[in-house]
C-alpha cells in the first residue's frame, strides 16, 4: 500500500515539474504593443477605428518619455524595455539587421553570443555607453531577456525608415523595447515592410496589406509582438516640407490606413489578449508647446478608464519605464532590476476628456514656470513640486 502511494505521489510530482511555463500562455493571453510614434491624444481621435474602440473600452494614460542623459524617441523606447531610464550610443551605432550569414558572423565575433533572427550589430556600443555614462543603472533589454528566459516568444514588425540626402536612413528602434540583453530579437520583419509611394512623406509608406498579413502570422507564432507604425513618425519628420493643406491630406490618408490596420488587429485578438497603443515620443509641435507627455492606451477587457502607477502616483500619469514591467506582469513575470511599476486600472468613462484637460493644464503651468523661473523662486517650488517632475 505504501509503495503504491509513493508511486502515485511520485507520478504527480513528475507531471507538475514537467509542465513548462509556456503552457500558461493560453491562460494569460498574448500581448501586442503598437508604436504610433509622434501622435497626440487629439490625433488618435482622428483614427476612426481607434476612436470607436475607445468609446467602448480602453485605459488611457499620459506617459513621461524621459531617458537617461537625454530625451528622445530611441531613449524612450529603450527605457520601456529596460524598465528604467536608459542611455544609448548615437544613432549611427544603433544597427539592427535581420541575420545573414555574413552579419551573423560579425555579430558573434563582437559579442560572443549566438545571433537570433534580428540583431543589433553594434550593441556593444550602447551597452558600454549605458554602463559607463548612465546615471540610473538600468539594464538594456530587460523585458525581452525576461520573456526569453521564461520561454515566451518575442517578435518585432515594422520600421520608421526615412530618406536623407537621397539615401535610406534606417530606423529600427522598435527593437529597443523588444530586444534581450544582447540586442537580439528572435522573430520578425524590420526590413521588407515598406513600399514606394511618392504621395507620402519621403516617398515611402508601410505596406499595410503585408503589415496586416504578417501581424496575423507573427501573432499566431509568438507571445509578444511589437509593431512600429512608422508612417506617423515619417509624417512628423517631413512636416517642414509641407504646407497646411498637403500636411492635412497626408495625415488623413495615413490615419485611414492605420484605421483599417487597427480594425484588423481588434478583430483578430482574443478575449485574454492585451493590446497597447502608444506614442513613444510627442510630435515636434507638441514638444515645443510643452506637451511633453505622450499618450498610451491599454486595451484589456471591456472596461474603460485611466492608467495609473506608483511611479508617478497620479491618476492618468504614468512613465515609459512602467511599460516593460506591465507587459511582464501580464505574463505573471517580474524582473527586480526593473524599477518601473505595473499599471493600476481606474474606472472612468470620460478618460479622453479628462486627460486632454490635464495635458493642457500641465502645458500651461510648464510655460508659466519657464517664463518666470529666474524671478519667482516660490513659483518653482510650489508648481514645480506638483507637476515639474512630469513636464519640465
Question: Can you annotate each of these PLM segments?
Answer:
Residues 1-5:
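Positively charged n-region of N-terminal signal peptides that target proteins for export
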Residues 6-14:
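Sec-dependent N-terminal signal peptides
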Residues 15-23:
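C-terminal segment of classical bacterial N-terminal signal peptides
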Residues 25-369:
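Soluble extramembrane regions of membrane proteins in the secretory/endomembrane system
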Residues 358-392:
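Core alpha-helical transmembrane segments of integral membrane proteins
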Amino acid at each position: 500500500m505504501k509503495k503504491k502511494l509513493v508511486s502515485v505521489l511520485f507520478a504527480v510530482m513528475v507531471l507538475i515539474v514537467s509542465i513548462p511555463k509556456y503552457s500558461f500562455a493560453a491562460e494569460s493571453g498574448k500581448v501586442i504593443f503598437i508604436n504610433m510614434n509622434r501622435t497626440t491624444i487629439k490625433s488618435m481621435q482622428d483614427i476612426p477605428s481607434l476612436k470607436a474602440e475607445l468609446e467602448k473600452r480602453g485605459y488611457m494614460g499620459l506617459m513621461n518619455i524621459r531617458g537617461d542623459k537625454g530625451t528622445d524617441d530611441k531613449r524612450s523606447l529603450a527605457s520601456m524595455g529596460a524598465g528604467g531610464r536608459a542611455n544609448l550610443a548615437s544613432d549611427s551605432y544603433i544597427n539592427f539587421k535581420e541575420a545573414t550569414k555574413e552579419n551573423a558572423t560579425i555579430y558573434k565575433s563582437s559579442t560572443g553570443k549566438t545571433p537570433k533572427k534580428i540583431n543589433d550589430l553594434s550593441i556593444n556600443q550602447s551597452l558600454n555607453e549605458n554602463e559607463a555614462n548612465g546615471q540610473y543603472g538600468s539594464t538594456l533589454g530587460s523585458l525581452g531577456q525576461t520573456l526569453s528566459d521564461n520561454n515566451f516568444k518575442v517578435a518585432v514588425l515594422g520600421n520608421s525608415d526615412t530618406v536623407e540626402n537621397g539615401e535610406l536612413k534606417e530606423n529600427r528602434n522598435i527593437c529597443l523595447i523588444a530586444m534581450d540583453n544582447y540586442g537580439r530579437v528572435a522573430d520578425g520583419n524590420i526590413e521588407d515592410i515598406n513600399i514606394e509611394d511618392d504621395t507620402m512623406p519621403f516617398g515611402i509608406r508601410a505596406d499595410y496589406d503585408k503589415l496586416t498579413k504578417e501581424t496575423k502570422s507573427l501573432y499566431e507564432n509568438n507571445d509578444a509582438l511589437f509593431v512600429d507604425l512608422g508612417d506617423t513618425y515619417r509624417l512628423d519628420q517631413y512636416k517642414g516640407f509641407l504646407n497646411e493643406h498637403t500636411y492635412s491630406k497626408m495625415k488623413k490618408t495615413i490615419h485611414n490606413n492605420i484605421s483599417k490596420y487597427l480594425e484588423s488587429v481588434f478583430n483578430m485578438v482574443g478575449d485574454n489578449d492585451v493590446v497597447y497603443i502608444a506614442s513613444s515620443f510627442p510630435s515636434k509641435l507638441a514638444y515645443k508647446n510643452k506637451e511633453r507627455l505622450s499618450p498610451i492606451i491599454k486595451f484589456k477587457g471591456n472596461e474603460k478608464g485611466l492608467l495609473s502607477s506608483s511611479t508617478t502616483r497620479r491618476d492618468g500619469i504614468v512613465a515609459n519605464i512602467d511599460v516593460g514591467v506591465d507587459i511582464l506582469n501580464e505574463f505573471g513575470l517580474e524582473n527586480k532590476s526593473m524599477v518601473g511599476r505595473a499599471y493600476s486600472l481606474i474606472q472612468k468613462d470620460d478618460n479622453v476628456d479628462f486627460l486632454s484637460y490635464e495635458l493642457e493644464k500641465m502645458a500651461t503651468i510648464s510655460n508659466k514656470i519657464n517664463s518666470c523661473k529666474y524671478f519667482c523662486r516660490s513659483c518653482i517650488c510650489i508648481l514645480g513640486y506638483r507637476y515639474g517632475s512630469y513636464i519640465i
